[in-house]
Amino acid sequence: MQRRVLLQSSMGLLMLSPWGFVRSGETLPSDAEVISSFGWATDVHHCRKSPDFWDEEGVAHHEYFDLSLEKFRKAVAFMNKRRPDFAIELGDFKDCTKTGSRAETVGLLDEVEAAFRQFPGPRFHVAGNHDFDKISLEDFLAHTENSDEMKGLTHYAFTKGGIKYIV
């Protein structure tokens, strides 16, 4: 046990020292050298849940779903400044309360999709497990919009900058 504490402490001190950070010598490519770029968001979990709640097993959770939409709006604003080739969200776009209705859940999806639509370039979605809480796949597809010919699809591929992206 004492050996473990010593090793953990030593690693922490090493990370804080000037020798603890590895420098690869790599630099970011210039804008002219970038082949393709994209904005990426995942697990937004937009919902109006109390920050402190208990699940069916009585386990307490401290999650701040009510802050997710504003954080996502900031992420989209950052993407707008960087101007990537496209933006993609990788699932769990919304969440829902245990007692939530289909209409309430679709409303949450509409709100977070409206924030995503502030990105002026091509936008794509990957459906996550929470995206189907209280709604169907058809509901999800009807209230989100992939760009180009990927509208209404859950599996697709597209090419940007000579790179093929497969979803």
Enumerate the language-model features and the residues they cover.
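Alpha-helix C-cap/termination motif
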Residues: 9, 13, 81-82, 118-119
